[in-house]
Amino acid sequence: KARPESTLTNWVADALYNQAIKVYTEPIAFAYQNYGGIRINNLGKGPVTLIKIYEIMPFDNTLVIVKLSGSEMQQFFDYMAAGGGSPVSASARYVIEAGKPVRITIHGKALDLTGSYYVAMTDYIANGGDNLVYLKDKPRLDKNVLVRDLLIKESKDKGMVKSALDQRVTLKN
């Protein structure tokens, strides 16, 4: 698993997004998966087994959606960029220049600082994990669905797991 993106982190973030739009009726901007929450470095070749899913996600985290204002989204992207990039679903893209996020897009449109967005993430992050304390008091929905179960469902729904590096997060020096 590499930064700012890898095939494994892209697959996990995309899987969370794909499953979130099935579980929730709110319009999901993107899915975020904290880098440290993915506990293996790569999937390797061959079938995705239940054991492999547990190795990826050994925690009993649930998938929640958190409502953020446009300025809070900017703060969230600032956090991700400062850490060298974080796994996001393909519906979000950003470039990191000098440790700052630029050219942030959501579903192909520039981030609207006056808008509001729903972001899918684990309850660990929504509860302030990884120093994202400001998320704790944000409006959220939690249908108590385990992230691990959603990864299992995604791998069953899609059959073969495919993921590519698509420059959703780009690091420029």
Language-model regions: role of each:
Residues 1-3:
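Glycine-rich phosphate/diphosphate-binding loops and the adjacent beta-loop-alpha structural elements
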Residues 6, 10-173:
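Feature captures C-terminal
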